Amino acid sequence: MTYTMDYSKLKLFIYMRPLLILLLTTLTAVSLKAQVEPCGPVPTENQLRWQEMEMYAFIHYSLNTYTDQEWGFGNEDPQLFNPSSLDCRQWARVCKQAGMRGIIFTAKHHCGFCMWPSAYTEYSVKNSPWKNGKGDVVRELADACREEGLKFAVYLSPWDRNHPEYGRPAYVEYFRNQLRELLNNYGEIFEVWFDGANGGDGWYGGANETRRIDGKTYYGWAETFRMIRELQPHAVIWNDGGDRGDLRWVGTEAGNVGETNWSLMPSKGDTPWHMLHYGVEDGDMWCPGETNTSIRPGWFYHDTENEHVKSLSKLMDTYYKSVGRNSCLLLNFPIAPNGRIHPNDSLRGIAFKKMIDEVFKVNLAEKAKTQVKGNETVIDFGKPTTFNRFLAEEDIRYGQRVKRFKLEAMVDGKWVALKDQLVEKGNGLTTIGHRRIICFPTVSATKLRFTVLDAKREPLIKKLGVYLAPELTADIPDAGEKKSSNLHLFFSSPTQMMIDWDAEQTISSFRYLPPQDSKDGTVTHYTLWASTDWSNWTKLASGEFSNVVNNPIWQTIKFQPVRAKMLKFDADRIATGNRMAYGDVEVVTGNN
């Protein structure tokens, strides 16, 4: 049986059966629900609301901003927190203009410093010079979000490197008390975000030691979750350990999820990387992936990254590999020391939103004729039409169903297969879910054919779209630094790298890129030495590369400019394995 109609009339669903496609253009949602059986686990109302947000912002801001760190140790002085022009309304305006529909704020990061005047600790803004200790950043941001029509959410680090009781039962009650403050006092919260980094070295009230915990059992997640659902019944929970939350990490902070992305997970057991990145087709609970990344290399502000803001083409690539792969995008905007989003970040974020609008402003399928037969949908443009993007959406209220599909364009009277150009292997035409966007080289065709090849049950396709995205220019190289050339590297031991160059010169920083294909050998703690003669060595710096395992980006060690001809880079601690590894190293010369 064949139906031909104006695509503009196809507003609700294409209900596909293996041998027959029925166009449901007049059924109400109630009557549809009466006729369609769910397929496996389905989303809750909270998860549906979350999925429809599509993009929202992370805001990282704490004492780390003033110590040029990603992870504070827990002994940083609250007197450092004194921004000259903190403006949460500017944050909210920028995020809204960048297309974000909400903001998640780091109310407390691993250092333990609270960005609200918590009644349970002195380590907070109430003991900073900002507003004479009377300020509350969480309050100001929550109010600003509601003024701008944005949703508000909180990040609360379970790990606290400041608290003396961390690792002991007393800390869990402290943690819940602080969570209760945030959930009770700042209006409706759309998401509660618990970081997966838990346990390690820290100040811990002066003990200055390493404490290990079992992240799955220590915090008593079941009881914590019950409290959240009681105090904030509309919130979703993101949790990277212990009991499953409503959302899952996608296994990387690079800003992408798998081209195959099931919103399903097993409710029990460990979650290896492939489960996080691709989901689990036969999972017994609905747990969609949230894709988190930063507009800069790091999560917190560093002035050395002002010229390293993600390019527009990189942001669009991130969009296609997150929102366009059945996920939501959580995009971080770090706050600069003055208390505002840096202009480089705000301008790029706003340009990002404008580009998304430009790509999707005209759905070429709306003026075409659509013919549906069996498991095929043919969109007939009536004349050669240029396009390079395809969009499909399932009605996930009834489960995620499509496993594999095919796209073909009619070019010069012949069907030509299309593939997703953003995947390295295969054609990338697998799952759909809430939204799937396929990118391919620009083609001029008279027709487009969409064929479902495999599905768990009858697919419910609620939207199809065809678009022409403008071409983006190549990325502009980063500027502002001179990197030394002619470096000579060798290893004097499995944990010591020696670097020298042709002539003595002034150096001001050293950059280390972790291995990109494995965590083995990644340096997490280091000591750096300089010399002019191989005999007398001056210690330049020692410290920690925070979060380097999850976010293996360039790590910069800055120091006072010094004359040197060689460096010694010691791996004091390695993530896994017993031999240090690297992707690249750079020595920055001059007095930068």
Question: What residue ranges belong to the model's regions?
Answer:
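Short beta-strand segments and strand-loop junctions that repeat across beta-rich extracellular domains
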Residues: 404-414, 449, 525-535, 566-568
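Bacterial Sec-dependent N-terminal signal peptides
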Residues: 1-35
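Exposed low-complexity, polar/acidic, P/S/T/G-rich flexible segments that act as propeptides
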Residues: 458-476, 507, 577-592
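Extended extracellular/luminal ectodomain segments enriched in beta-structured repeat modules
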Residues: 383-389, 445-446, 502-509, 563-566
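Noncatalytic modules at the cell exterior or secretory-pathway interfaces
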Residues: 441-453, 560-572
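Surface-exposed loop/edge segments in extracytoplasmic proteins
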Residues: 413-420, 474, 534-542
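Short beta-strands within extracellular/lumenal beta-sheet-rich domains
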Residues: 372-383, 491-503, 554
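Mature catalytic domains of secreted/periplasmic carbohydrate-active enzymes
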Residues: 35-441, 451-460, 467-471, 511, ...
